[in-house]
Regions:
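Bacterial N-terminal signal peptides that target proteins for export
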Residues: 1-8
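N-terminal signal peptide c-region/cleavage motif recognized by signal peptidases
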Residues: 17-22
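Bacterial N-terminal signal peptides
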Residues: 8-15
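Sequence context surrounding c-type heme c attachment/ligation sites in exported
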Residues: 24-60, 64-156
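Residues in and immediately flanking transmembrane alpha helices
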Residues: 15-16, 117
């Protein structure tokens, strides 16, 4: 539990420091903050994906830590990251976020809720072995992919 508290405090400090730093280094601060948040997701998902695929030796403690990191990230308010006027229609190549994300018919909040539920499930089984990890990771990937497919411009 102490590791989780230290990790939570560290992630919060990193987010605040990163957002403060981003504000003074060119580009839109909201876009920089959301990219940093997504990089933290990607880093932890990469560790878990490697274990689930057998590319990296499964380690229960490392899997639990990465899954708990993801769970902690879902508790950080992203409201300021997704400010209106920060899509690729307004900011061009600075972001791949499509304008539909802010549309009245956007399902992004629903997908985000599904992702949170999938991450909670993942965190509850990450230490239970490679097979359990892989099965739970699929739900997270499905939610991430749904949002990216609908609201992120494909890479060139």
């Amino acid at each position: 539990m102490n590791k989780f508290i230290v990790l939570t405090v560290s992630l919060a400090a990193l987010a605040v420091t990163g957002a403060s730093w981003a504000g003074g280094h060119g580009g839109n601060p909201a876009v920089k903050a959301r990219k940093a948040h997504m990089q933290l997701y990607a880093y932890n998902l990469g560790k878990l994906g490697g274990m689930a695929k057998g590319e990296v030796e499964y380690n229960a403690e490392a899997a639990e830590t990465a899954a708990n990191n993801l769970a902690t990230l879902t508790t950080v308010s992203q409201a300021g990251y997704w400010a209106p006027g920060t899509s690729n229609a307004e900011l061009g190549e600075e972001t791949r976020a499509l304008p539909g994300l802010w549309g009245a018919d956007s399902t992004a909040m629903q997908i985000g809720g599904e992702m949170g539920e999938a991450i909670t499930q993942l965190a509850s089984v990450a230490g239970d072995g490679q097979e359990a990890l892989g099965a739970a990771l699929g739900g997270v990937g499905k939610a991430c992919g749904a949002c990216h497919k609908a609201y992120r411009q494909p890479a060139n």
